[in-house]
Amino acid sequence: QEYLFGSRRPDERDRAHNARAIPPIVWAYWSGAAAPPLIARCFANWRQFNPHFSIRVLDDDSVRNYLGELPEALEHASATLRADWIRLELLRRHGGIWLDASTLLTAPLDWVLQQQQRSGSDLIAYYLDRYTTDAQFPIVENWFLAAPPQSALVADLQHEFTHTVLPLGGAGY
């Protein structure tokens, strides 16, 4: 099911359809040692289905090429919390598609770019129907997120994450 959040007036819909496009970039992050064979096969799967996309699998060193220095609060954070911050910051700055490393594709990702161009959405994502109690506010999964650069929604999420989640830690939030 497709959701458009908020009550958009016609002039807002026009602006949305002029939104910047999601670039054909797939982002992922792997912390620590080399990825195990299963994860390496997932990365190969992405390249096989999407030869025209830039597939960027980052580690603790290469992530700095795209984001510069990371917040001090991430130095001792869990790999999960670190990846959560990195995914939002990459999408906020550069746009693209975030996939968790263990994601196996069954088709090319062109549909994501096409869907965003049709809808003008700030974010393409899956939601958890099981936990969504109000259809106006679905619980969005973060293993797959796609956004244009400077997405207002992603910027808001990243601001909340940086200024609330990081100081409290994942469990405290």
Could you describe each region identified by the protein language model?
Residues S31-A34, D61-R64, T103-T106, R130-T132, ...:
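Short, solvent-exposed loop/turn segments at secondary-structure junctions
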